[in-house]
Amino acid sequence: MTIIRKKHPLIKIINHSFIDLPAPSNISSWWNFGSLLGLCLITQILTGLFLAMHYTSDTATAFSSVAHICRDVNYGWLIRYMHANGASMFFICLFLHVGRGVYYGSYNMIETWNMGIILLFAVMATAFMGYVLPWGQMSFWGATVITNLLSAIPYIGTTLVEWIWGGFSVDKATLTRFFAFHFILPFIITALVLVHLLFLHETGSNNPTGLNSDSDKIPFHPYYTIKDFLGVLILLMAFMILTLFFPDILGDPDNYTPANPLNTPPHIKPEWYFLFAYAILRSIPNKLGGVLALILSILILALMPLLHTSKQRALTFRPITQTMYWILVADLLILTWIGGQPVEYPFIIIGQTASIAYFAIIVILMPIAGMIENNILDLD
């Protein structure tokens, strides 16, 4: 068996990636989220495949086909809610994974980090298009509002929006193409994940100290396969509790009303995992400015390696920057809350303050904190 594992052209790739991979001996549970994201992706592809067998991407029947899946298909309700809540679990793991990367300075592995940002954009695009497919009120109006933002692009904006819509409004053509893209993107994401892993295995994993761990490695299997399996069990338990006991807690009640272009919902808002970016978008009164801020709210992650001023990699031994980091986390939670609130006083001013704080902490305060710590430790 050992000979096959190490000699077979295909199996040896798996062996070098998941079995005999040299891993730092001290990586904590924060390093579990990569494997959990892989599990989430597989779950989403499988449940999505079974949903696609019964779903019809036509404005006249899309809403009814989802109802049919829940009522008439064997365990259709379970597959549908696993897919919907699986997206939420996916984003929880994604945010924790990115947060880990920021905390421990993993962004210094630039290729891996940039690939991760591309993956984040791809997953967000996939989730947005998936939210349109049930063709409820929030699906329709969410698609209308978000795609309409592209009209802010000078000169080509209006033409671009109508090209994406396939007409003069969100309609049958839009739904059909969104279904096509929503189906194909997860497979593209899977390929990008392999590239992400390829880049990671070029440098090896980071660790909680931020120090070079080449002199202290252990094989991935059995140590981290067992450790990851514990994470998988915890995730599956949380996932099934959410799916079986509280399937609608993260959804919007408006999406149980069929899409009606003549009736606008009182508060148009995306799924919870986009609310922080939506709050940043809404906090700027100018349309183009809002769109740029929305894109920059994610793209700013690409600047992290350039904004790293400290001589130490991780935040483990850097209390000032640690404080900034946790203020940033709190700020993101505030933005998430604001994104779900109506556009009125005092929510507008809270959203604007939180948006300014978000960019200021990343671009100004954390780099300054790094330099102060260098001076305190006399590392300059």
From Swiss-Prot:
A single GO molecular function, which one? ubiquinol-cytochrome-c reductase activity
Q: How is the cofactor bound?
A: Binds 2 heme b groups non-covalently.
List locations, semicolon-separated: Mitochondrion inner membrane
* A single GO BP: mitochondrial electron transport, ubiquinol to cytochrome c
Q: How does it sit in the membrane?
A: Multi-pass membrane protein
The residues that the entry says bind heme b b566 are H97, H196
The entry marks the following residues as binding heme b b562, namely: H83, H182
UniProt keyword list: Electron transport, Heme, Iron, Membrane, Metal-binding, Mitochondrion, Mitochondrion inner membrane, Respiratory chain, Transmembrane, Transmembrane helix, Transport, Ubiquinone
UniProt: a ubiquinone binding residues: H201
Q: Which residues cross the membrane?
A: 33-53, 77-98, 113-133, 178-198, 226-246, 288-308, 320-340, 347-367
* UniProt xrefs under InterPro entries: Cyt_b/b6_C, Cyt_b/b6_C_sf, Cyt_b/b6_N, Cytb/b6-like_sf, Cytochrome_b, Cytochrome_b_C_euk/bac, Cytochrome_b_N_euk/bac, Di-haem_cyt_TM
CC cofactor: heme b
- Would the keyword Signal be found if you checked this record's keyword annotation? no
Query: What are the record's GO terms for cellular component?
Result: mitochondrial inner membrane; respiratory chain complex III
Indicate the family of this protein. Belongs to the cytochrome b family.
Q: What does this protein do?
A: Component of the ubiquinol-cytochrome c reductase complex (complex III or cytochrome b-c1 complex) that is part of the mitochondrial respiratory chain. The b-c1 complex mediates electron transfer from ubiquinol to cytochrome c. Contributes to the generation of a proton gradient across the mitochondrial membrane that is then used for ATP synthesis.
Q: Additional comments on file?
A: Heme 1 (or BL or b562) is low-potential and absorbs at about 562 nm, and heme 2 (or BH or b566) is high-potential and absorbs at about 566 nm.
Assembly and oligomerization = The cytochrome bc1 complex contains 11 subunits: 3 respiratory subunits (MT-CYB, CYC1 and UQCRFS1), 2 core proteins (UQCRC1 and UQCRC2) and 6 low-molecular weight proteins (UQCRH/QCR6, UQCRB/QCR7, UQCRQ/QCR8, UQCR10/QCR9, UQCR11/QCR10 and a cleavage product of UQCRFS1). This cytochrome bc1 complex then forms a dimer.
| Protein's recorded name | Cytochrome b
Source organism per entry reads Microtus miurus (Singing vole)
